Amino acid sequence: MKRHEMVVAKHSALCSRFAQDLWLEQNIKDSFQKVTLSRYGKYGHKNLQLRKGCKSVDECKGHQGGFNGLNQCLKITTSKIFQCNKYVKVMHKFSNSNRHKIRHTENKHFRCKECDKSLCMLSRLTQHKKIHTRENFYKCEECGKTFNWSTNLSKPKKIHTGEKPYKCEVCGKAFHQSSILTKHKIIRTGEKPYKCAHCGKAFKQSSHLTRHKIIHTEEKPYKCEQCGKVFKQSPTLTKHQIIYTGEEPYKCEECGKAFNLS
């Protein structure tokens, strides 16, 4: 996750999509002084959205005088024009770290009507809905596999080409994804950076922590389509489903007898 130096602009202006995407109404007011812009490239005044008829920030009375209450701001948000208080700082070079941190927040207000899954960002919910509609999927020309994110499409392409640009400086082992290299380094160091806030247990991978957190809740998101039984973890559901498939994956090395449970 790249961290960029933040440079504060003299004038105040903020794109609406950031606030609309990440915060609900009650959180926007408290967040004004802390926000960083969403991923829109390198921002300058010429890139910001202004009122009709305004050619620059200096000509826009809204930017000079700030906004007249929170409600006015929220109304403008819907039209993709957001006027902020003149004391709100705008970043020219901003970090993606705030956006990344929001993914790990417990506040997941945006719920999918199809599968009841909750997400922390509106853009994530919009993208998630495509899973159900199969809309605008990105297809790999080599293997035909489809993805709902264009960034995920680059991963199988590197597998097909054999390209491994990410190299471990310690052992020299190379990987086709930077995330796999990161996991590899953590295994080498024994570091467990992902800690459970409930019990303090630490994990090497964020996915392991996410799976662990379900233990502390009553949530059982994994349901068997055969009998309707629900489980907290997908591996438990997978083991349960073997009962219906007749599969016996666990084999005794001594006599060769196979079993459906370990």
UniProtKB/Swiss-Prot annotation:
GO biological process: regulation of DNA-templated transcription
Annotated compartments: Nucleus
Listed InterPro entries: Znf_C2H2_sf (IPR036236), Znf_C2H2_type (IPR013087)
Domain of life: Eukaryota
Keywords on record: DNA-binding, Metal-binding, Nucleus, Repeat, Repressor, Transcription, Transcription regulation, Zinc, Zinc-finger
Function as written in the Swiss-Prot or TrEMBL entry: May be involved in transcriptional regulation as a repressor.
Family statement: Belongs to the krueppel C2H2-type zinc-finger protein family.
Protein name: Zinc finger protein 138
Species for this entry: Homo sapiens (Human)
